[in-house]
Amino acid sequence: MQHSNFVHLHLHTQYSLLDGAIRPEALIALALEYRMPAVAMTDHGNIFGAVDFYQKAMARGIKPIIGCEVYVAPGSRSDRNTPSRGEAAFHLVLLVKNQKGYQNLCKLLTKAYLEGFYYRPRVDKELLKEMNEGLIALSACLHGEVSYNIGLGQMDSALKAAAEYKEIFPDRRFFIELQHNGLAEQEKVNKGLIEVSRALDIPVVATNDCHYLKKEDARVHDILLCIQTGNTVNTPNRMKFATDELYVKSPQEMCEAFKDIPEAISNTIEIAERCNFEMKLGEHHLPEFPVPPGETLDSLI
């Protein structure tokens, strides 16, 4: 069976707590229907669902791509002086290529919770420079550092941020993420993202930042946001998404949306083919304790 020419690489399941409304089993069934050879899971700040997602995808013959949309502190992860919650962290999508990448993602998230927690579990560029091997990075949504600066009209800052990420993730491991999601701001930012891509020779990739399975699930997701923020659907001026297009679009829909920049579609397949992590389950991996000269483990106990 010929597979589709597009794969979703930015997607939030129910493990994006009170934000994602996609159940892994339903996602995998839809990926099969769309003939996708692979699909990613990139929940906010955690990989709580990694084992569940991996097992269910493998059982149905779909390649699971483990990932995470991490929060990146604008400065140091130890800094607690950012003026507001909205400026406390940028978004960055990390996808696991191999065993080393999975180990590094686990280490990054552990550090984020233990050392960088401020509203959200945050990493910083110091950690990314140290623990990037085996990971592919995508520039994320409008809350990504590059997109955020473009939205403010600060093109120089956007170029600087993109150049930093390209240096941190060399060998074609950093991609500029483009989305067509019905948001006017996104369309404006896309133009700037393409400029950044061409100026710095950074490849682009198409995503949809999926938060729910089908378009009609947008209202259910809106109720989930109300629970998250302690509001009701009738609360004025509450937080809500200004689009109903953050669903798992078909390959045909994505190809049509990006017909003017087809490499953004083909690059999803390239990335999927480069991600080949095999999760070894049912094995015991005990920690190694260094033993001083002249000692044994028994003598130390």
Annotate each PLM feature.
Residues M1-I301:
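Phosphodiester-processing cores and adjacent nucleic acid-binding clamps
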